[in-house]
Amino acid sequence: MDQDAFILKEDSEVEREAPGGRESLSDVIGFLDAVLSSEPTDIGGDRSWLHNTINTPQGPGSAHRAKSEGEGEVSTPSTQDNRSGEESRVSGRTSKPEAEAHAGNLDKQNIHRAFGGRTGTNSVSQDLGDGGDSGILENPPNERGYPRSGIEDENREMAAHPDKRGEDQAEGLPEEVRGGTSLPDEGEGGASNNGRSMEPGSSHSARVTGVLVIPSPELEEAVLRRNKRRPTNSGSKPLTPATVPGTRSPPLNRYNSTGSPPGKPPSTQDEHINSGDTPAVRVKDRKPPIGTRSVSDCPANGRPIHPGLETDSTKKGA
C-alpha cells in the first residue's frame, strides 16, 4: 500500500538522523503486524488512527516525534484523497448488489403482471406445471368479434364432429387435408389431386400414363411375325429375289403355286418363296420320273384328268 511505503520511507530517514533508530524500527514492525492481522472488512472504516504519532520514550527520540508531526500535517491532503477514493470504491461495490436486487425485483413484477393479466394471481403456480389444469381454455370465445378464417372453423367443426370424416370416406368423397391450402386443379391435362397429396401437379398429360397395356396373344403373334421378317445376321443378305425397278412380276395362278403358266411343265430350277407370314425358305422342285409326263392341274378344257386314265408310252405303241 502507498501509506505503508510512506511510513517505511519515513522510518528509514529517522534511522539515519536519530541514534535510537532501532527502537523506532521495532515499533514500526509491531505496527505493521497489527495492520496485517486486522480483518479486511475494516478497510472502509475510520483510518484516522493510522496518522497518529507513535509515542516514543523522551530523549534522543524527540526529533523523530517532531518530524513526524510536521510531515503528518503536510501529508494530510493526500491521505484525504486516498480516503475519498476508497470510500467511492466501497460505495460502488455496495451499489452493484443493490442494482442487481432492484433489477430482479423489476423482473418479478413484470412476470407477475404478465401472468396476472391473463389468468389471475395463481398464474405462476399454474403455468409452472403443478399437475393441474393450466387455466387456458381449449376453445376460447371470440370476445373481440374478429372474423375467424374458414380453415379454423373447419378444424373446429371436425373436432366437434369426429364422425364426419368416416362418413366422407364411406360415401367415397375425397378427404381433403385439414388445415392446409388445397392445390390448384389443372383440369384435364394435369393431375387433379384436390388436396389429397402435397406433391405438385405434373405438367404432362395424364393420358400418356396409359401406354403400358397387357399384351394379348394376337399382339404377341404379330410381334413374332415382324421379328421373323428381319434377318438374323446383319451380314447375310435376304433370300428374296432381286426386283428390277420398272418391271412387274407375273401374277401367281391360284391353281399353280410355282408361278408357271397353265399347260407348261413346272420349272426345274430353284425358286424362292417368300410369303408375308413365313420366312424366306429355299424350295427345290424334284424332276418327274422317267417315262411319265407332267400334267397340269387344270387343262384347257377345265376338266381334271383322272390319274388312272394315264397310259405309259413305253408299254404301248403310240
UniProtKB/Swiss-Prot annotation:
Start-end of Polar residues biased regions: 50-59, 191-206
Stretches with biased composition (Basic and acidic residues): 7-20, 83-101, 150-168
Keyword Phosphoprotein: yes
UniProt keyword terms in alphabetical order: Phosphoprotein
Keyword GTP-binding carried by entry: no
Highest taxon of source: Viruses
Region (Disordered): 1-23, 38-318
Location of Phosphoserine modifications: S68, S125, S192, S249, S257, S260
UniProt miscellaneous comment: The P/V/C gene has two overlapping open reading frames. One encodes the P/V/W proteins and the other the C/Y proteins.
The protein, known as: Protein W
Organism: Sendai virus (strain Fushimi)
